[in-house]
Amino acid sequence: MPTTLMLLPCMLLLLLTAAAVAVGGTRLPLEVFEITPTTSTADKHKSLQYTVVYDAKDISGAAAATGVASSTVKPATEQLTVVSISSTAAAEKDLAESRRHARQMLQKQQQHRSIIGGKHGDRDVRILYQVGDSEEDLPVCAPNAVCSKIDLYETPWIERQCRCPESNRMPNNVIIHHHSHSSGSVDSLKYRNYYEREKMMQHKRMLLGEFQDKKFESLHMKKLMQKLGAVYEDDLDHLDQSPDYNDALPYAEVQDNEFPRGSAHMRHSGHRGSKEPATTFIGGCPSSLGVEDGHTIADKTRHYKMCQPVHKLPVCTHFRDYTWTLTTAAELNVTEQIVHCRCPRNSVTYLTKREPIGNGSPGYRYLFACSPLTRLRCQRKQPCKLFTVRKRQEFLDEVNINSLCQCPKGHRCPSHHTQSGVIAGESFLEDNIQTYSGYCMAND
């Protein structure tokens, strides 16, 4: 007995240590858990046979059990209560008045939210940090790194990955040429002349010494500013017409899909339309929920924001090029996502390879490639979509979606793991992950 009491504190210490390691360990990104029919769960998904939950026998048995239970219970004797008719009418009137007042208050709240929803919608987005709880705790982004990840599955929320360098913290990094303006004050003309002579013509004076060849100076400055990362508005229309141009909405042209359709294309840095709102930044990283800022790569239900404009990235080749790599560092408890190229239109990403970092580091590097959208028709009792759901400590559901096949005509695939036609699958308790299989449902 004394020996057991002496060993009890040691056992408690080991349990606490294991719990601390489990909580404080490196949390892998959910994109790493790509559970598809090509993995070890292929046979389970292929041979999956589900029966009707409420069978006729179960219903009849339940009704019989209910009847037996109800026949054995005797009703309790109730005493008659004399109620005044006038008091009952007054109570009903007060209840109706309170309900009417509650409906009016609810309508006022809804009108207030609809009015201010467009103005302050982005302010209500929850912001999480993969390290610490402020911008100062985040590392500085590497070249072509993802600075923020926006989840649009349910309520939008942002996970900050890193801080953009100071050289990239220019919200409108686009040069607008000074065209001839007929209307303008003398002060503005003086400012333009001073700006051109003291700033734009500085390199010209060093090369030629005189203000003579304006065409040469403009070309020289244009190439110099392009090397610094600026984008000229004259080049935007030319890039828009490229056949390899990515519209960042791969599901917009797919038939019978549940994703929102839209005609928005991936714009470039600072190139905004007349009706598009100004881009907001957090730590130098764009934080708007749309793809019009030119720094966004859309994949499934996530938007990946970058410090650099995405049009500078080359276009990937299906199944051959790695679109991005996820590197986990256990000692720093951070994950770095580096984008190498952008997927073509109507493409999705998938996990293709995992390799150790090397150099004695315990982390891994996950490689992702591009794949065209599946055109295979779903067979009978075959899941059309797989949901991988992880419960986070911030009381959020992080969900990854894998489309397995296309539902036949007249059917739809569930878009949420809580909708009808979705059945719970395998669980991974060590990673706090639950999988769900979605099946085709007939349209109402």
Swiss-Prot record:
Domain of life: Eukaryota
Glycosylated residues (UniProt): N333
GO molecular function, one term: receptor antagonist activity
Compartment(s) of residence: Secreted
Repeat region (Two-fingered domain), residues: 316-370, 378-444
Record keywords, A-Z: Developmental protein, Disulfide bond, Glycoprotein, Repeat, Secreted, Sensory transduction, Signal, Vision
Signal peptide: 1-24
Entry-linked InterPro entries: Argos
Disruption phenotype: Flies exhibit transformation of the eye mystery cells, which are usually non-neuronal, into extra photoreceptors, and supernumerary cone cells and pigment cells are also recruited. Mutants also exhibit abnormal head involution, a change in a number of sensilla in the antennomaxillary complex and abnormal morphogenesis of the maxillary palp and wings in later stages.
Free-text tissue specificity from the UniProt record: During embryogenesis, expression is in a segmental pattern in the ectoderm and in the nervous system. In the eye imaginal disks, expression in photoreceptor cells begins a few rows posterior to the morphogenetic furrow. Also expressed in the wing disk. In the adult, expression is seen in the retina and lamina.
Pfam families in the record: Argos
GO biological process: one example: oenocyte delamination
Ranges of the Two-fingered domain 1 part repeats in the UniProt entry: 123-165, 285-307
Disulfide bond recorded as keyword: yes
Disulfide bonds: C141-C162, C147-C285, C164-C307, C316-C341, C343-C370, C378-C405, C384-C413, C407-C440
Subunit structure, interactors included: Interacts with spi.
Job of this protein: Regulates cell determination; development of ommatidia and optic lobe. Is a signaling molecule involved in the process of axon pathfinding in the eye. Part of the Ras pathway regulating programmed cell death in pupal eyes; activated by lozenge (lz). Antagonist for the Egfr receptor (gurken). Inhibits Egfr signaling without interacting directly with the receptor, but instead by sequestering the Egfr-activating ligand spitz (spi).
Domain notes: The three two-fingered repeats tightly encircle spi, providing the basis for it's sequestration. The first repeat harbors a 120 AA insert specific to drosophilidae.
Protein name, as recorded: Protein giant-lens
Organism for this UniProt entry: Drosophila melanogaster
